[in-house]
Every structure is written in structure tokens, then in C-alpha cells.
From Swiss-Prot:
Encoding gene (name): atpI
Descriptive protein name: ATP synthase subunit a, chloroplastic
Keyword Hydrolase: no
InterPro entries in UniProt: ATP_syn_F0_a_bact/chloroplast (IPR045082), ATP_synth_F0_asu (IPR000568), ATP_synth_F0_asu_AS (IPR023011), F0_ATP_A_sf (IPR035908)
GO cellular component: chloroplast thylakoid membrane; plasma membrane; proton-transporting ATP synthase complex
Amino acid sequence: MNILSCSTNILNGFYDISGVEVGQHFYWKIGGFQVHGQVLITSWVVIAILLGSAALAVRKPQTIPTGIQNFFEYVLEFIRDVSKTQIGEEYGPWVPFIGTIFLFIFVSNWSGALLPWKIIQLPHGELAAPTNDINTTVALALLTSVAYFYAGLAKKGLGYFGKYIQPTPILLPINILEDFTKPLSLSFRLFGNILADELVVVVLVSLVPSVVPIPVMFLGLFTSGIQALIFATLAAAYIGESMEGHH
């Protein structure tokens, strides 16, 4: 009963987290729900960039790739290596998921530094990278949780739940709690790093000449790429762990 109560409290915590606000927001009413309009706008822009780039890469495929096709093949090989290292020999079906997560986060993070979001005026709030909003990072983390639950159940069936009493039933509460702390750590790590990076750049631009924050912006681009890699690597590791049952 205590475990059920604890799980309910954690789920309620996720709901509260999704309502965390940093600055002003532009809201849309969809049915009976209130959503962050600027997050949807910037997410659609990122998705459009990814789809447009992919369309250009496969428009005229060549045996010896060049240009954007060569770049995407390099990215695909990189994602395959990450997936194989973390998941194992059964990595194949999960490459599209890990790749989508990585590319969406990577482009979202970089868009915060490279795209002139500020010139677009909204009735309330302002546009920023999608990963600058806790709703986006929590959604990505919960999607990862669904993925590794599905991977474990598809591989082991109901026997997957046996992991909660390994190596001893005494660890049952801790093993259950772990499934809630994983998405929490994923979402807060990504959200905190991207928000902090954008805030630092904004503060420096307001305090010093525009040329001074440029090194910080380059450092932010590097950090943003690393955060995308960390998220994708951990997602693959969690999926591999659920399939193998290793802790």
C-alpha cells in the first residue's frame, strides 16, 4: 500500500513538474487543456528542419554519397554504433527511435543559439529552444520510459517484472522507485543545462559588448551536442538494461 501511495505521489509530482514556468508563456486552448503555444511552434520548426533535411538527403541518392547525404550517413553510422554498444546485438529495431531522440534534441538545442527566435513577437512570452521548456524534456523522458518498458515486456513477457525482486525481494521498493527516478533525471538534466546556457548568454549580452559572449555561445553549442548524446546514450542503455535484466 505504501508503494502504491509513493508511486501515486511521484506521478502527481510529474504533473506538477509539467506546470513549472520560467518567465512568461503564450498559451493555447485545445479542448479543455491549456498548452504552451510557443513550445509547439518551435517544436514544429525543428521537426520541419529535420524532415526537410532528410528529404534533401534522399532526393537523389548516390552510390558514393556527397554533401548532405554523406552527412546523414555519417550520423546514421554514429547512432548505430551508440545503439549497438548500449543495447547489444538486438539493437537494429531501436536505431530509428534512438536516432529520432538524438536528432530532435540536438537540433532543438542548437536552434536556441542559432535561430533568431527573439525577432518573432508573441502576445505573451517569447520563443526559445523546445528543450528550454520542462514540458518537452519530461515528454521525451516519459517516451523513453515507455520504450524501455515495451522493450522488456516484448523480450521477456510478464517475466520482465521479476527484475523488481532481484537480487533480493527486499529491494522491491528501490527497484520500483528507480523506474520513476530515471525519467526525472533525464528530464531535469536536459532542461537545466539548456535553460542555464540560454540564461548565461542573455545575461552576458545585456552586460557586455556583443562580441564577448561569442566564446560562451560556442561552448553552449558544444554542451548542447553533448547533452543530446548523453540523453540518447542513456535511453539506449535503459532499453538494453530492460532487455537483458542487468542493473
